[in-house]
């Protein structure tokens, strides 16, 4: 799961402990100079002022989150910028929950501990390019992790994941299918919705390592169909790989390009005063 520099993310650590799933692997990308490296369990690179990721508040961080460490784990993070970074992970095989979620992310509330109502957004687009070439040894998936609050408050209302590249990522309860895209350069695609505990998961039917996502209508669909409260607001967005196992060997996960673009609703233009007839 995501560590996004918000105090309420103690909740994430509690919830992730219950996330049990299988999890595919990554190939190395091009070598680029790193400005930050860390192998600490919860090591953080940042803050970055990265114009390709727009938000309401806070800076962008890249985190080496290891939420459920097991004996023998090793994971190192090497960051050039929030859109180009890589992780080398060595996590023993076994029927384990998600061990780590190396990820880039930040907050979208008016403060670090609040959310921004979805009604205040005109669009939320994101694009990605990553390498995760699955083998039989690794259990992992590339995913957005989106946390929502109630209106502009700090009260948590839900967690939504968007998975687009995965292998052996466990079973979840199928709920529905829906089609999104067609604006902002995002292709029209059909997604499957399933539920895993308290988590709502949008999944592409087939893997995609380069693409774009129209996030706002996916969240509004969940509100309209009763999966999220009507007053839901955007709290935080993370993006990375949830890793369960690499089979006890070193595997590389590479992010080559990443962006999030948010556009607020434009205020209504002032109307000219009406003239009295006379």
State what each model feature region is.
Residues 205-278:
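Long, compositionally biased interface segments
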């Amino acid at each position: 799961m995501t560590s996004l520099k918000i105090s309420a993310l103690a909740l994430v650590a509690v919830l992730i402990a219950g996330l049990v799933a299988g999890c595919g692997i990554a190939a190395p990308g091009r070598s680029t100079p790193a400005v930050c490296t860390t192998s600490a369990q919860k090591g953080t690179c940042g803050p970055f002022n990265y114009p390709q990721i727009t938000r309401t508040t806070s800076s962008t961080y890249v985190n080496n989150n290891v939420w459920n460490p097991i004996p023998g784990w090793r994971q190192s993070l090497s960051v050039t910028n929030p859109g180009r970074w890589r992780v080398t992970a060595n996590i023993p095989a076994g029927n384990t929950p998600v061990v780590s979620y190396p990820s880039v992310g930040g907050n979208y509330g008016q403060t670090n501990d609040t959310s921004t109502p979805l009604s205040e957004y005109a669009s939320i687009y994101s694009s990605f390019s990553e390498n995760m070439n699955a083998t039989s040894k690794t259990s992992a998936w590339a995913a957005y992790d989106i946390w929502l609050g109630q209106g502009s408050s700090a009260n948590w209302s839900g967690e939504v994941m968007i998975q687009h590249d995965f292998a052996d990522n466990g079973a979840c309860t199928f709920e529905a299918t829906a089609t999104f895209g067609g604006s902002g350069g995002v292709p029209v695609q059909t997604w499957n919705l399933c539920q895993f505990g308290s988590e709502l998961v949008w999944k592409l039917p087939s893997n995609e390592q380069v693409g774009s996502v129209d996030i706002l209508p996916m969240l509004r669909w969940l509100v309209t169909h009763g999966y999220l409260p009507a007053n839901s607001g955007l709290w935080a967005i993370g993006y990375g790989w949830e890793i369960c196992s690499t089979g006890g060997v070193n595997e590389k996960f590479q992010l080559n390009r990443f962006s999030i673009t948010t556009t607020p609703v434009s205020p209504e233009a002032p109307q000219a005063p009406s003239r009295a007839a006379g």
